[in-house]
Curated annotation (Swiss-Prot):
Requisite cofactors: Zn(2+)
Annotated source species: Streptococcus pyogenes serotype M1
Biological processes, Gene Ontology terms: 'de novo' UMP biosynthetic process; purine nucleobase catabolic process
Protein name: Dihydroorotase
InterPro entries listed in its UniProt record: Amidohydro-rel (IPR006680), DHOase (IPR004722), DHOase/Allantoinase_Hydrolase (IPR050138), Dihydroorotase_CS (IPR002195), Metal-dep_hydrolase_composite (IPR011059), Metal_Hydrolase (IPR032466)
Gene Ontology MF annotations: allantoinase activity; dihydroorotase activity; zinc ion binding
Binding-site positions, Zn(2+) 2: 150, 177, 230
Length: 422
């Protein structure tokens, strides 16, 4: 048993926000009240700290199988725990791609060994070929939670329509990476900074928002649910808002990096700040924040994309892979760039990092209640920390190294067990 004493208990589902004690027995919260006494329990003094549901991150790359020099499921789970994350959804762009039941079962067997809750998407198309839709029914029955070709945009409208119909038939949804290759230049560099400083055509805004426009309208026609991944453009927020007003089943996420900083960071942090979609302009950054405030964007998800140091340490930045390690900085970026400036309340931030992503997938997570799951994060919301290369992840490809950010995770509890510090 674990007894958490005197913390500020915050639950986005019930809107509870009060200093209280939380008693955990096994994998459940058994009591939330003031002044709980339990002699046999391990006591955690949470005075002055926030006690919240464990974070739910629905967009991570754990690189297993096939790319475990970057990350593996075990180190990914450690990184999640260090960041206060107790539930994750992995993407399917492994090697081999999670397109068949056999590969899916191998990945889930590895995930089951970890102490946090690890789910995975399967791919929409076979090995990301963009042509042949996978067996949704068989993959769902084998444990996939949804479908995404994340990392590779789905170019064929015909295939997308087929996938939406299949998703509907199986009561699921599709998540999409929106960057039309035919309208894009060099990935990872926003078009403005690409032209001005690097003198080539970069990743354009129209490549993102035009593809979103196509996809939300096909989803509208098919009455299918589409989830837009890591949108980054002001116009993308407007397109999603329009589709939602029309009655389309559209949800959207934003990554912390896109509400925290801009393309200029490429000139300072180099390849660590190269990602898809790229860091954009201040106008775009403020627009995605407005999307979070208005409720157009309901989910914050990291797109945790670890890479080996040697892969990122190259003379030609265009040759470096895109992506950044994100699980261990996401809460701090939210506190620093959303809560501290007054864009979101702490409760609203927690809602977008816990309850909303859990509801999207139907997970029993993202809330604190008696008889509910004992998945919690305990953190100091005002305390500053210096971001260093000392990550639990195998990777340290973060453009935020050297930054002072708000928020220090003190304890992460998953299934009633303290998993950080471990």
């Amino acid at each position: 048993m674990i007894l958490i004493k005197n913390g500020r208990v915050m639950d986005p589902k019930s809107q509870r926000d009060q200093v209280a004690d939380v008693l955990i027995d096994g994998k459940q919260i058994v009591k939330i009240a003031s002044a709980i006494e339990c002699q046999e329990a391990q006591v955690i003094d949470a005075s002055g700290l926030i006690v919240a549901p464990g974070l739910v991150d629905i967009h991570v790359h754990f690189r297993e199988p096939g790319q475990t020099h970057k990350e593996d499921i075990h180190t990914g789970a450690l990184a999640a725990a260090a960041g206060g994350v107790t539930t994750v959804v992995m993407m399917a762009n492994t090697n081999p791609v999670i397109s068949d039941v056999e590969t899916l079962q191998e990945v889930l067997a590895s995930a089951a060994k970890e102490k946090i809750h690890i789910y995975t998407n399967a791919s929409v198309t076979q090995a990301f070929n963009g042509k042949d839709v996978t067996d949704f029914k068989a993959l769902l029955e084998a444990g996939a939670v949804s479908f995404s070709d994340d990392g590779i945009p789905l170019e064929s409208s015909k295939v997308l329509k087929e996938a939406f119909d299949l998703a509907n038939a199986n009561q699921t949804f599709i998540s999409l990476h929106e960057e039309d290759p035919q309208l894009n230049g060099v990935l990872g560099f926003n078009e403005g900074i690409a032209e001005e400083h690097f003198h080539f055509c970069g990743a354009t805004g129209v490549a993102e928002y035009s593809m979103i426009a196509r996809d939300v309208m096909i989803a509208y026609d098919r009455q299918a649910h589409v989830h837009i991944q890591h949108l980054s453009k002001a116009e993308s927020v407007q397109v999603v808002a329009f589709a939602q007003q029309l009655g389309a089943k559209v949800t959207a996420e934003v990554s912390p990096q896109h509400f925290s900083t801009t393309e200029d960071l490429l000139l300072i942090a180099g390849t660590s700040a190269k990602m898809n979609p790229p860091l954009r302009t201040q106008r775009d950054r403020l627009a995605v924040i407005e999307g979070l405030k208005s409720g157009v964007i309901t989910v914050i998800a990291t797109d945790h994309a670890p890479h080996h140091k040697d892969e990122k340490t190259v003379d030609d930045m265009t040759k470096a892979p895109s992506g950044m390690t994100g699980l261990e900085t996401s809460l701090s970026l939210g506190l620093t760039h959303l809560v501290e400036p007054g864009h979101l309340t702490l409760m609203s931030l927690l809602e977008k990092m816990t309850l909303n992503p859990a509801l999207l997938y139907g997970f029993d997570a993202g809330y604190l209640a008696e008889n509910g799951p004992a998945d919690l994060v305990i953190f100091a919301d005002k305390q500053e920390r210096l971001i260093t290369e000392n990550f639990a992840s195998k990777a340290s490809n973060s453009p935020f190294i050297g930054n002072k950010l708000k928020g220090v995770v003190k304890y992460t509890i998953a299934d009633g067990e303290v998993v950080y510090p471990n």
